[in-house]
Amino acid sequence: MPKRSDIKKIMVIGSGPIIIGQAAEFDYAGTQACLALKEEGYSVVLVNSNPATIMTDKEIADKVYIEPITLEFVTRILRKERPDALLPTLGGQTGLNMAMELSKAGILDELGVELLGTKLSAIDQAEDRDLFKQLMEELEQPIPESEIVNTVEEAVAFATEIGYPVIVRPAFTLGGTGGGMCANEEELREIAENGLKLSPVTQCLIERSIAGFKEIEYEVMRDAEDNALVVCNMENFDPVGIHTGDSIVFAPTQTLSDIENQMLRDASLKIIRALKIEGGCNVQLALDPHSFKYYVIEVNPRVSRSSALASKATGYPIAKLAAKIAVGLTLDEMINPVTGTTYAMFEPALDYVVAKIPRFPFDKFEHGERRLGTQMKATGEVMAIGRNIEESLLKACRSLEIGVYHNEMSELAEVTDDALVEKVVKAQDDRLFYISEAIRRGYTIEELSELTKIDIFFLDKLLHIFELEQELAAHVGDVDVLKEAKRNGFSDRKIADLWNQTANQVRATRLENNIVPVYKMVDTCAAEFESSTPYFYSTYEWENESIKSDKESVIVLGSGPIRIGQGVEFDYATVHSVKAIQAAGYEAIIMNSNPETVSTDFSVSDKLYFEPLTFEDVMNVIELEQPKGVVVQFGGQTAINLAEPLSKAGVKILGTQVADLDRAEDRDLFEQALKDLDIPQPPGQTATNEEEAVEAARKIGFPVLVRPSYVLGGRAMEIVENEDDLRSYMRTAVKASPDHPVLVDSYIIGRECEVDAISDGKDVLIPGIMEHIERAGVHSGDSMAVYPPQTLSKKIQETIADYTKRLAIGLNCIGMMNIQFVIKDETVYVIEVNPRASRTVPFLSKVTDIPMAQVATNLILGKSLAEQGYKDGLYPESNHVHVKAPVFSFTKLAQVDSLLGPEMKSTGEVMGTDVTLEKALYKAFEASYLHLPTFGNVIFTIHDDTKEEALDLARRFDAIGYGIYATEGTAKFLNEHGVHATLVNKLGENDDNDIPALVRTGKAQAIINTVGNKRTYDEDGAAIRSSAIEAGIPLFTALDTADAMVRVLESRSFTTEAI
């Protein structure tokens, strides 16, 4: 069926900010879809609130709106643009829920907009637990016994009837939000109450637990002519009971017999046909390991995290083809762009094994609840490809960047047997390492399979890895054993440990004996047909399929898995850098390990190596490709950390040189550079042990900001008030960086701002200054940023521009750099310099219209700013106001305190743009799901340090007609100063009148809660904050953010005055 000619303009809804459960995979899907629709000649309108995406670049769609994805704003855009159709299936749960809302509000009918891809009835059938159950019964597909409930009592009654354990699944939520496994009534009451609250339709499904079954996923495609195929099947290493986004996953399935595979494949195809889905769909099934019994767990009628993984695992571009199916093309008339010869109807076949391991944020959240269950907690993931399970698993382990280079964590050697068994049984994010440790201690794989319900086949592979370790230790220097270990994915570093050598010695032995990897192509057809994709993985075999081209090449290092502090912003910069390298006439080669992102789409670069970002793996590619040089500026700290070892090995680092990178990162050198350039900085010192730190702090004076050098996202950073706190910090946190000392700085409370600059060594272009709304003390990644600055005088802006230029030239920066300033009493201090692209690059590129990463890449390749048409100095300001606001994923992370400080906690960002600051702020708050009605009540619970300041806020809330509740000390203070505040208890003293009760009953619309600089962990405060997070009401832990919210409310409210 040819494509439809009755529709001309199509609107695509993006997935908004990155949160746990909905990450960069939707930028990849959305980008592919928009380009595919444009390729077919349609006019594309895109709405997405997240500026850090490639998808929101001007050239991806014909019109791009970076606006909140809310009914109010999307309706406005629909009325203005009048598209013929809407494609919501590429925007994750956000896109689907938005389509449902638009339909229910009658907007789609009013404007005659047709839904493409998946009909509303199918979305409803897949998402609404009751309808899904009915459909499965009609198709005679088995599902676990279950009951839909709307109250906690109904849940308890059903669970009593079928017996525990049971699983709670809220309707229409994302990544298992609010759900969980309950072993008894007490757990059920707690989880069901929370789940009903979080479900937009107050509905949960209570179902019999089938934990322990194998979890299998099928990624399926169907078109309007009812052609359907399985793109990829995948098997979870972890059994049912752990969210698939938090599971280690292998593709293709490893332990199924042919009969089982056919049975589940037939079920998946039957379901997608019954739902009449046009496009991609993901079916999750549970298989009883002891019989042919299976259950259908759930169906996602949209492109998902698993589809991104399936696309990268097979090379089959699901989102691109799904978009084309949505406009009427069929699978048997589209060519598979990978082979260029076979049709899209042809099911991919794999002659390799893919392993995916999730990346968790617990390195940032020490207090977080690490137990895994049906609610997702991972922020990102890595993927690795090998010729066997051992190889792909070990490559994935060293891609994680959690300080391991094998399936082993050295600190687990200290764990007692009892603690070890508990961690093996009760899965946490690091269970793989505990199981591997148990095998090293002699636990049998039969025992472990019994304890974990993980298939013995996988445990046998871990046993094989251990046997190879013993083999290596027994045969030091043996070349045959070395070959065998390399074929099974061992890193040089691990072999070096076992041989008591250095990794470089092992590497030398390898090279002498010509034990080097070959690179195999990912071609979707197991080498059956000719294929031309430049997409490779390494393995230790014979035939190399990656041929070095005659063109001079440049390698760009990506940023690895998405984690807090290093998000999709760096992928954005990587992709732009590649575009510039290609435009300059070089061959652009990307190395990266993240399956979710645009940079690992093989059509982006000339060659893609899907490999871990470690010195060994990068060096192997460099030795084959012999590039002109390597670009490390755009891959975040991951790539910067590789600059020194690569440079020592004789690799040319393009852009700012390693010695200069060091001057920005090494404290003493940096202080000296600032002194030489005559630029003020907060007084500080370095310390290598506890006594030195205390000595330094006495000299500088408390409060001080302490942190290790060389970290990203403010890891292990704290503001300390006194000597005791400092001593405890030195004892607990300093492990963060043993070779690098700890920095002790005077903590200056002032206005903070930051600058991204691009320098060619002579001229320095400053696209703009971003002013932070929160004062110093809140990590820049968690602050709201405003461009252009609203409160900085011309003189201060000139000073900032002058210091920026001095620093860029003084540090011999070629390419990009990011500088953070704090301003107190009209003095501008430099807090830190990052000699690389930072997380604000996409935002600033969008608001100034300067493709910053491309400009910087051209400089790195030798083309000056003047040659590119840019002048030295501060770029003229935009006439709109733009606000970048952080978005957090606290609802997914139990026991993580939502108090903001110098350690970064946000997972994503949104942008609000308008003609005034108030309007831009309103949009930013709406886009980040912080909705405040124009009247209501606000709760104040304020630390003594900030009461004076909170008084002004309370007066303003009072003036616009808000009711004020306050805890004891705060209420007394406010009432004494003429603001009427109603007393409320902190916690539990009287249950009807404590803060959680007010929040529960909907009497409070926001909470403002500050703590002093002392920031010790306070349980009451944490409980108050989490009650706001659970209820989804705005929580402000910085008065500056609350002040911004009041400005918005003031601009939208009316005054009532007597005449």
Curated annotation (Swiss-Prot):
Entries under PANTHER family matching the protein: CARBAMOYL-PHOSPHATE SYNTHASE [AMMONIA], MITOCHONDRIAL (PTHR11405:SF53), CARBAMOYLTRANSFERASE FAMILY MEMBER (PTHR11405)
Subunit: Composed of two chains; the small (or glutamine) chain promotes the hydrolysis of glutamine to ammonia, which is used by the large (or ammonia) chain to synthesize carbamoyl phosphate. Tetramer of heterodimers (alpha,beta)4.
Superkingdom of the source species: Bacteria
Residues bound to Mn(2+) 2: E298, N300
Record key words, sorted: Amino-acid biosynthesis, Arginine biosynthesis, ATP-binding, Ligase, Magnesium, Manganese, Metal-binding, Nucleotide-binding, Pyrimidine biosynthesis, Repeat
Domain ATP-grasp residues, every copy: 133-327, 671-861
Name this protein carries in UniProt: Carbamoyl phosphate synthase large chain
Binding site for Mg(2+) 2: E298, N300
Encoding gene per record: carB
Binding-site list for Mg(2+) 3: Q820, E832
Amino-acid positions noted as binding Mn(2+) 3 in the UniProt annotation, renumbered to this chain: Q820, E832
Stretches the record annotates as Carboxyphosphate synthetic domain: 1-401
Organism name: Streptococcus thermophilus (strain ATCC BAA-250 / LMG 18311)
Enzyme class at the top of the EC tree: ligase
GO cellular component: cytoplasm
Enzyme nomenclature, EC number: 6.3.4.16, 6.3.5.5
Occurrences of domain MGS-like (ranges): 930-1059
Purpose of the protein: Large subunit of the glutamine-dependent carbamoyl phosphate synthetase (CPSase). CPSase catalyzes the formation of carbamoyl phosphate from the ammonia moiety of glutamine, carbonate, and phosphate donated by ATP, constituting the first step of 2 biosynthetic pathways, one leading to arginine and/or urea and the other to pyrimidine nucleotides.
UniProt-annotated binding residues for Mg(2+) 4: E832, N834
Annotated spans, Allosteric domain: 930-1059
